[in-house]
Regions:
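Catalytic donor-sugar/metal-binding loop of nucleotide-sugar-dependent glycosyltransferases
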Residues: 265, 274-292
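Long helical/loop segments within the catalytic core of UDP-sugar-dependent glycosyltransferases
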Residues: 131-140, 144-168, 179-267, 278-279, ...
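A conserved hydrophobic helix/loop-capping motif in glycosyltransferases and polysaccharide synthases
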Residues: 72-80, 95, 189
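Short, acidic, metal-binding catalytic loop of nucleotide-sugar glycosyltransferases
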Residues: 88-101, 111-112
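A conserved acidic beta->alpha catalytic loop
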Residues: 108-130, 148-149
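N-terminal membrane-anchoring/stem segments of glycan-assembly enzymes
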Residues: 1-67
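Cell-envelope/extracellular polymer assembly enzymes that use nucleotide-activated donors
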Residues: 70-72, 103, 257, 272
């Protein structure tokens, strides 16, 4: 229906609405027409890409536990509360995977040496540093921080990459709690395909966004994440073009290090990294089953800031 209406609009716009009334009017009319045609081209391209969603991908389970690769779990944090970090770290320790092949790391960018050395942030940074180190020791996981906060999250993850050596890396935001079977349902794909660099899983959120909260009285509308993770991403998977979405993803270290780790040239380091590795001929897999439980921004300011950052980075 959308395609039919778009074609009808193109015919009307091209054959009946373009009337020359003067040079200045023509310039404005032409610019608007070209902008509309560009938008419609993107619409049809998106519809074409989404024609063949790849669903029902079979799970590849490892046959022999001795063949399982080593896995580093990175829990990236900056200024989130200790309680949120603790829940995710505990869940990571409960994942069903051989313990001698699993290492969990809290990657803290809120307690860096730089923050601990600045008068305005010194006290809070030192307190956070000691608290998270104590928490990590209590839970039996590692605590990693660095000297500065350069390149934000990308720099944090790259620092952790340079201080670990697991064959695979599970990336988690600190408010993304993994299921116990997450590694069991993702690691097997890497054993089946040596050129695979990414297995991405959906982001599932337990709380509504500020926009969804205001949609009272209109039933239970599908959120924007549903459209991306249930419709768009399975279609991208058909074209071997899955995104790295920054969290809830397993990556192969060797391929990642070929491009210098997580790319930090833009503020959407995850998508940039996926584009670069796809351009080198490596493969990706999207597993449609949600295997993390996360938190959406709770207020409109944080929501707008997050979406603005995504939009700027993709541009």
């Amino acid at each position: 229906l959308a395609g039919y209406l778009a074609m009808r609009y193109i015919l009307w716009r091209s054959l009946q609405s373009l009337i020359y009334t003067g040079p200045l009017d023509f310039i404005g009319m032409a610019l608007l027409y070209l902008a509309e045609m560009y938008g419609l081209i993107l619409l049809f391209l998106g519809m074409f890409v989404n024609l063949w969603p790849l669903t029902g991908r079979p799970t590849i389970l490892p046959k022999d536990a001795t063949d399982l690769p080593t896995v580093d779990v990175f829990i990236a944090t900056y200024n989130e509360s200790d309680d949120i970090i603790r829940i995710t770290a505990i869940a990571a320790t409960q994942m069903e995977y051989p313990q001698d092949r699993l290492r969990i790391h809290i990657c803290d960018d809120g307690g860096t040496l730089n923050k601990r050395g600045q008068p305005e942030s010194m006290e809070a940074a030192w307190e956070r540093h000691y608290r998270l180190r104590r928490m990590a020791k209590e839970l039996g996981v590692n605590y990693i921080t660095r000297g500065t906060n350069g390149n934000a999250k990308a720099g944090n993850l790259n620092h952790a990459l340079n201080h670990t050596d697991g064959e695979l890396v599970l990336m988690l935001d600190c408010d993304h709690v993994p299921t116990t079977n997450m590694l069991q349902r993702t690691v097997g794909y890497f054993l089946a395909d040596p050129k695979l660099f990414l297995v991405q899983t959906p982001h599932f959120f337990i709380n509504p966004t500020p926009v969804e909260k205001n949609l009272v009285g209109v039933g239970n509308p599908n959120g924007e994440n549903d459209m991306f993770y249930r419709t768009i991403h399975p279609a991208l998977d058909f074209w071997n073009a899955s995104y790295f979405c920054g969290s809830a993803a397993v990556l192969r270290r060797s391929h990642l290090m070929e491009v210098g780790g997580i790319c930090g040239k833009t503020i959407t380091e995850d998508s940039e990294t996926a584009f670069l590795l796809h351009s080198k001929g490596y493969n990706s897999v999207y597993v449609e089953q949600p295997m993390v439980c996360g938190l959406s921004p709770e207020n409109y300011d944080d929501y707008a800031l997050q979406r603005t950052r995504w939009a700027q980075g993709m541009l």
